[in-house]
Amino acid sequence: MLKKIVTALGMSGMLLASNSAIADDKNTETATPQSVDLSPLRNLNKLDSPMDKDYNYHQAFKKLDPEQLKKDMQDLLTQSQDWWPADFGNYGPFFIRLSWHDAGTYRIYDGRGGANRGQQRFSPLNSWPDNVNLDKARQLLWPIKQKYGDAVSWSDLIVLAGTVSLESMGMKPIGFAFGREDDWQGDDTNWGLSPEEIMSSNVRDGKLAPAYAATQMGLIYVNPEGPDGKPDIKGAASEIRQAFRAMGMTDKETVALIAGGHTFGKTHGAVPEDKVKEAIGPAPDKAPIEQQGLGWHNSYGTGNGDDTMGSGLEGSWTSTPTFWNHDFLHNLYNLNWKKTLSPAGAHQWTPTNAKPENMVPDAHKLGVKHKPIMFTTDLALKEDDGFNKYTQEFYNNPEEFKEEFAKAWFKLTHRDMGPKSRYIGPWIPEQNFIWQDPVPAADYKQVSTQDIAQLKQDIIDSGLTNQQLIKTAWDSASTYRKTDYRGGSNGARIALAPEKDWQMNEPAKLEVVLAKLKEIQTNFNNSKTDGTKVSLADLIVLGGNVGVEQAAKQAGYNIQIPFVPGRTDATQAQTDIESFNYLKTKSDGFINYTDGSVSADKLPQALVEKASMLDLNIPEMTVLVGGMRALNVNYDNSQEGVLTTTPGQLNNSFFVNLLDMSTQWKKSDKKDGEYIGIGRKTGKQKWTASPVDLIFGSNSELKAVAQVYAENGNEQKFVNDFAKAWHKVMMLGRFDVQQ
């Protein structure tokens, strides 16, 4: 039934993918070396932002009175508006759904989605069928946003709305952090196939690949009626587990979130099935201009209140839909549930043995009562063995249920914010959680300029090569993802499982480097009597800087790469192995690495994706690739793309030789994805290269940048630009010094 309702609600926001789709930047699915898309490297949000160039959210936030904002939010909850009346006289459940669906797009596979940048305001998310009528929720918040202006972001306000609502209805949160910054346009996340692709494809069902975090088209998580709209309880359990694990949630957290969330509010399917198609207008991105960004206009009855049309399911779960309790679990276990249909024709369940105390008040008519409902997905929490364990536990221990929901809600709404150092505001909980990728606070004095000079000399004297130092530092820092601010050099997790065992990090070689750096660290720390210490994380980065500086010196250039100490070393206990494995890259074009799962023709686009994750622009990506090739730091000492007669020296040889027309490039007949550079006159092999290397001479935009670095007179510029880009990568994740 949901498919019919979704069609009526408008397919403009619906997204679908076959089970073979790749959850990555949407451009990777059709990219070839000839058609590499550089748009992920263009920071259009800054260009499109209406804010002043010097606007800083952290500074603007200092003008905010959080307590007054919270009071205004609390007052709003019970100020029902005629144009969209509040169910039960309280917008709290509506705002909980708003926050949940905003944060619930997060996916752990690539860090995309989530609440951090307020993407729910833009297409396609604002028009997803699962987000039906949330445009009204955001509109209800507008007077508050208008009042406080740029002192609070939309993305913070949307999440705060749900959190304040919980507290107002008796569920005390464990805290809330401000610090989310707004985007100004829809991003390029691949959520699945577009409606046009759906109609033209031979996709046989609406199931999404696991990496998409949802399981069916246009939904945040799963179809509440059951898989593909069929009331299959066991199948629903499987899809729930898939969807929530894709967000990084455990079974316990999943049960807490669903059972806790369905303690509040109601679902809407009041329009008769035969009236849905004609009554419901298009989603916001296809709505008539006079509707001013509001979609899903409902011409049935009053169009709101008791005539509201949402998911198509109709009813409430408990008799107290605006108060926290564990009645959802009580009803789940003590009522006998029978399959039925909502007025809109959606599969749902009602009890055959409901007592007067179980009856649910009508959301708008005083004195009218209804039977409670359950979704197919709700019943899965009882019938599935893994979920049943926790529903029973929570049913028998209401206080534990309350505590676990509070923790799961905080995780849901803060997971994509990155480390705790990005949090601002007065309500940050003191407790640290492993999903925050915590690093310990430094309980020692940081190294001085003199100490840094001594450590650099110790590194030079250690016997480690420039290549060893550079690659180790790169492998450590380049785990960063700008999407959810995870990874980076802070924590030195390259010395811990799982990173130390990743293929791309060449574990045997890595172990040698880390052992020597740890020796330097121990000797230095033992020699200091004033409380000064250096972390392994700082030494890894400093070692990389030393390697680059020495390589530049060998080429005749004197540079000093900035070094900002303050990184600390995480412990294995602070590191979630399963979660960190999602940071493992399939390919890293900066070191010509691939695990074999990415086809050769997709490697250039994968490089762009990697550069985007590192928050690089086109020139930065270009100069880093050229420099890394000259430095001879490819994975497994591969010579592909090392287009220089002075390997290990930091110079612009890569670009000079790539653009030299005395070389003719041909595909290798021995190795897929390898190209042979042959002298036009001699006919002899000069070089080998990968598609990643050759894209800088093939793609017109990249070639234009490459030519700048190959020009006579720009040799020093190349070295300087490489050093700046290198430093930028080494500083990724250092939010402790970037606010």
UniProtKB/Swiss-Prot annotation:
Gene3D superfamilies: 1.10.520.10, Peroxidase, domain 2. It comes from the Bacteria. SUPFAM superfamilies: Heme-dependent peroxidases (SSF48113). Binds 1 heme b (iron(II)-protoporphyrin IX) group per dimer. The record marks R97 as: Transition state stabilizer. Disulfide bonds: none annotated. Formation of the three residue Trp-Tyr-Met cross-link is important for the catalase, but not the peroxidase activity of the enzyme. Pfam families: peroxidase. There is a cross-link at Y221-M247 (Tryptophyl-tyrosyl-methioninium (Tyr-Met) (with W-100)). Keywords: Heme, Hydrogen peroxide, Iron, Metal-binding, Oxidoreductase, Peroxidase, Signal. Bifunctional enzyme with both catalase and broad-spectrum peroxidase activity. This is Catalase-peroxidase. It comes from Francisella tularensis subsp. novicida (strain U112).
